Amino acid sequence: MGVHLGLIAVVSSRDELASVMAHELSHVTQRHIARMQDQQGRTTPFLIAGMILGVLAASRSPDAAGAVMMGGTAGTVQGQLNFSRDMEREADRLGFNVHAQAGFDSQGFVGMFQKLQQASRLNDNGNYPYLRSHPLTTERIGDMQSRLGLGKTFAPVETSIEHAMMAARARALMSPYVDDMQKLTDVLEKDFSPELPLAKRASMLYAGVMAYTQQRRAAQARQTINQLLQLVREDPAGLRAAQWLAADTERRLNNPTQCLQTLGAKVVDRARVVLQTQCRLDAKQAALAAQASDAMQLWLAQHPRDAIAWDLSSQALLQTGDRLRAMRADAEFHVVRWDEVGAIDRLRAAQELAKQLSKDGKLDRAGNMEASIIDSRLRSLERLRRELLQPY
């Protein structure tokens, strides 16, 4: 499951983002797609029966035949729409409970539906609710407000500095085009003011740094990142995000050494681990590549489902010259992304490489162990693939 950058950019708080994820994950946990298919299977006989009756009626009255066929089709489609709206209400209800139990502000649900209503106000007048796959947005807002309880105020959720900066990052990453980058820098240079809210100023500076970096304007990027670091120095989460941006900016400006110095030696979380590994790989030095490989191996021992870590591990191993392990890491990257076919292809290529190395006398003890792991993983993935292809 992924999150679209546009969603991160449009929400005002992490509570609103969590409300969308809670709703969508409720669809998954309640198996709504499977239930929809089951519902369609139960209504198909009625649709076929309507068509048969229409054919039988055609000999006496063509109009009656058309009416019978259309009536059967309309009844089937209406039943599917009713079922779809019920599933949406169920996802709202269960998602609301999950959202609250996870510690998020339930007002985020109301705020997200209000944004949805605002976005569709010009092309949706609320007519024909019985012909919709989703309940009316006004109905969903009322339902969420009633669940919050009577007498509760609905003040706007305040945007945190960290969220404002991540929304700015999403906006900068959404489009790599020159004109869009120029718009971000123009907004910073023309509209930035000390009178703006702190979160807004942090957002503008963050987006400006990314735009300047994309434009290869190194001096402006470094000057802006210093402004950002000074602005958010009293907010721990915001300061951490700004420090990561400072390091990433140096990396994108082809200065991996400064990137590593900015990060420091203490690595305790995923973002810093990944960024440090990227900087080491960009340095194109054998010693740093070996350090990157060791760091990724340690991280993957505790987080084996991290696709980006597997990809970085593969790159690091290639730089150290360990092609066999690099190919297996690439295969594991495909496995985590549910691409069993791609993983099997990489493992088979690794098998061929191991055979060639063995034939040339270049496969040492560690290589033999790696070849055995590759054989075992290939067998397990091929077995999994056969199970997935079996009919129910």
Can you say where each PLM-predicted feature lies in the sequence?
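Alpha-helical linker/edge segments of TPR/alpha-solenoid repeat scaffolds
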Residues: 141-142, 154-155, 252-259, 283-292, ...
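Extracytoplasmic and endomembrane cell-envelope/extracellular-matrix remodeling and assembly machinery
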Residues: 79, 84-268, 294
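Membrane-active amphipathic alpha-helices enriched in small hydrophobic residues
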Residues: 45-60, 67-77
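Catalytic Zn2+-binding segment of zinc metalloproteases
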Residues: 15, 25-42, 60
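TPR alpha-solenoid repeat register
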Residues: 204, 238-242, 272, 309, ...
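TPR/TPR-like (Sel1-like) alpha-helical repeat modules
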Residues: 328-358
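Alpha-helical adaptor scaffolds
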Residues: 243-256, 260-320, 324, 330
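Short pre-active-site segment immediately N-terminal to the catalytic Zn-binding motif
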Residues: 2-19, 83-86
